[in-house]
Amino acid sequence: MPAACRCLFLLLLSACVALLLQPPLGTRGAPLEPVYPGDDATPEQMAQYAAELRRYINMLTRPRYGKRDRGEMRDILEWGSPHAAAPRELMDE
């Protein structure tokens, strides 16, 4: 039994360390904005910056089909069908 506890402890410890060593991400897992190399950067550095900036913009502006927030989905489901009849109190006015 002590061997099983030690094995479980090592597994838990390694999982925690693996989670702590993840690279930092921006909000909601978005990539970090590339750092401008400065006005005196070489053409190669500027080309690399332009490529990184293009990738960054493409990641932020890509369409996310079917990736709605659960809160938004809950609100939409509460609205009901757009073809449903209006409540009586609204129809009497």
UniProtKB/Swiss-Prot annotation:
Cell location: Secreted
Modified residues (Tyrosine amide): Y65
Predominant place of localization: secreted
GO cellular component: extracellular space
Taxonomy, superkingdom: Eukaryota
Keyword terms: Amidation, Cleavage on pair of basic residues, Hormone, Secreted, Signal
InterPro entries to which the protein is assigned, alphabetical: Pancreatic_hormone-like (IPR001955), Pancreatic_hormone-like_CS (IPR020392)
Pfam families assigned: Hormone_3
Pro-peptide positions on chain: 89-93
Entry annotated with the keyword Magnesium: no
Any one GO MF annotation of this record: neuropeptide hormone activity
Signal sequence, renumbered to the chain: 1-29
Key word Ribonucleoprotein present: no
A GO BP entry: neuropeptide signaling pathway
CDD domains assigned to the protein according to its UniProt record, in alphabetical order: PAH
Coiled-coil annotated spans: none
Stated family: Belongs to the NPY family.
Stated name of the protein: Pancreatic polypeptide prohormone
Source organism per UniProt: Canis lupus familiaris
